[in-house]
Amino acid sequence: MGSGEVDGICVNVGVQNGATTGMQAAPFGGSVRCVCKTGGGHSLVAGGDGGAGGNAGMLALGAAGGAGGIGGDGGTLTAGGIGGAGGAGGNAGMFFGSGGAGGAGGFGRTTGGIGGTGGNAGLLNGSGGAGGAGGAAITGPGGTGGAGGIPGLIGNGGNGGDGGASVTGTGGNGGAGGNGVQIGNGGNGGSGGTGAAAGKAGLGGLGGQLIGLDGSNAPVSTSVHTLQQAALNVVNEPFQTLTGRPLIGNGANGTPGTGAAGGAGGWLFGNGGNGGHGATNTPATATGGAGGAGGVLFGSGGNGGTRGGATGGVGVRGAGGGGGG
């Protein structure tokens, strides 16, 4: 067992598949959060899984769960290899705080690693953590994106992670976005990765029952909810046209394979869109797009897009929103 420092307080950490995983912070730790996590080790056969992010203290006020570790690369120098799975994001404290982001899946020559699931928010306030992106592959399928986490009564559902790209195989499917509860948006469904055949986009989360916009690619809901969504779209249209971001809603995901940046979340609240992954069949320097910024009142920044080419490294992650983000 090793030791990791969390906001000035040391906690024990464990080891999982060669990856360090943070233990839960002290139950009465105030604003302490557990952020200790380590990526999985690389291998010629199968990369190690990333460690899970630590949970915040049970009664911590506004502390976020730790981010999951990135899965290790598999088969970087050989014909075979499976990318390691990304670690799950840690959960927030019991009542307040946002869930941690899931770790990205590792690159695998034959199969990309699965993205980690986003952590859940506190019961009253906080946004769900974003799901990690699936890992890239060359000859086989890209990894599936992780599901977004569950928010509190006030907060946005986490975006689903984008599916991993593949050079000659099928792109990975995107992860599902988390549903809003009362006030807040549903998370965007993760975009499908590019490949010989593109992966499917994940289902978007539904907006909160009182107010909130559905995430991208959300399923059909009740007639009352559909009318609510139509009214919000009318309100959002002039803001989107004049400023490039909605009043209430998430930013759009960047187009997969272009390295385009994700759009910014709403002026009031919303998640930033995920950045699109870089182009495939290109050098490893084909970078992914930056994630969009979160909403002004509350909202999480979008995940950065993974690189194209043959590496599956991670792009820049968007800035989180202020306030409850």
What positions do the PLM features span?
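Collagen triple-helix signature
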Residues: 1-218, 226, 248-325
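Extended, small-residue-rich solenoid/repeat segments and analogous flexible loops
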Residues: 221-253
